[in-house]
């Protein structure tokens, strides 16, 4: 899993977070603080099972399980597909951005994708 964050120049003033191997392990506080989410792209084109990308409004998440962090946002991507979700008005995250990816929609789901998708999201 490789996670990169790219700062964008004005007038955007935003960040692009890219995780080239999103798994069931939470990646915490990717942007280093609060912000607004504007777009998420999930590239699951190399995997034959659907995935659920989960984002939590926290700087310290625990992915899935009985004591897992509840996701603020859950986005579905079908098998062998790429999906983009755009939020023109943005979704505010006051505590930070933490994410993980699993094969089940349930909050307690912990099953990792056999082939992790690449996920990108744009924040301010």
Q: Where are the regions a protein language model picked out?
A:
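Exposed aromatic-hydrophobic patches
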Residues: 82-90
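Short proline/glycine- and polar residue-rich coil/turn motifs
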Residues: 75-81
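Short beta-strand/loop motifs in extracellular/secreted proteins, especially
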Residues: 38, 49-53, 117
